[in-house]
Amino acid sequence: MSQIQKENVAFLEFKTFDGIIHGVLFLAAVWLPFFPAKGQDQRFADLSTTLKNVQTEIVNKHNDLRRGVSPPPRNMLKMQWNTTAAANAQNWANKCLFKHSKKEDRRVGTRNCGENLFMSSYPSTWSNAIQSWYDEVHDFVFEVGPKSPQAVIGHFTQIVWYSSFLIGCGVAYCPKQSLKYLYVCQYCPAGNIVGRQHVPYQKGTPCGSCPNHCDNGLCTNSCEYEDTYSNCASLKETWTCASDFVKTNCKAACNCQGKIY
C-alpha cells in the first residue's frame, strides 16, 4: 500500500503598525537537480521541473484550482512560473530533510515565499500532489477557517491565496527515507498571513477587482512591491506617500494603485 504524507508552511511574519516583517538578504540559489545514480525509473525523471511540460502542468493545475474556488474570487491573481523560486525549491528538496526550509531560503528578490511539501513512497504526478494539498478545502469554511481545531488547511489556503502569483517547484529522490519522493513548491509572495487565513481572497464576481486585466477569471495586474505594514492603506490616506516613512514602508500602496497586492 503506497503511503503519502504532506506538510505545509506558508507563513509570512506579519505584524501591524507596531512592528515589521522580519527578513534577511536574499541568498542566490544555484540550480542543482538531483537524480539517483542507480535504479531510478522513467516516472521520476518525467517529474523534473526543468521540463517545460512539467512547469506548464504545475502552473495550469494551480490556476485551474484558483479560478474554480467557491465562493468565486474577485481578486485572484493568475500564477506564473518563477525560475528563482523553482531553484530554491529544488535545492531544498535535494537535501531530503523532510522539514521546511528557512525563511531566508524562501525568497525571490525582496519577496518572502510560502512553501508546501508532499512526500510519497512512489513517484506520484505533480497534479496528484497539488490536488492532495487542495483537498483540504473539505475541512475549510470561507470566512470562518478550519472546521475543527485539528484540521489542517494551510496547503489549501496557500494554493488559493489571492496575491501569491509566482510559483516554483522541485522534486527529489531520497533513498534513505521510507517515503522516498519529496516534492516542494514555493509561492511568492507568501500567503497564510496571520489573522487572515480564513479569508484567502475576496469573494465576488471573478475579476471584479481587475476588469481590464482579466484572463479567464484570474487577474493579471500583479504588483512588484510589498507593504511592510498591514495598515498601509490608512497610513497612506493619513500621511500620504510624500512622507518618507510611508514611501519606504508602503511601497505597494504608493506604487501599485489599480493593481492586486
Description of each model-found segment:
Residues 2-261:
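Mature extracellular or exoplasmic CAP/SCP-family domains and secreted bioactive peptides
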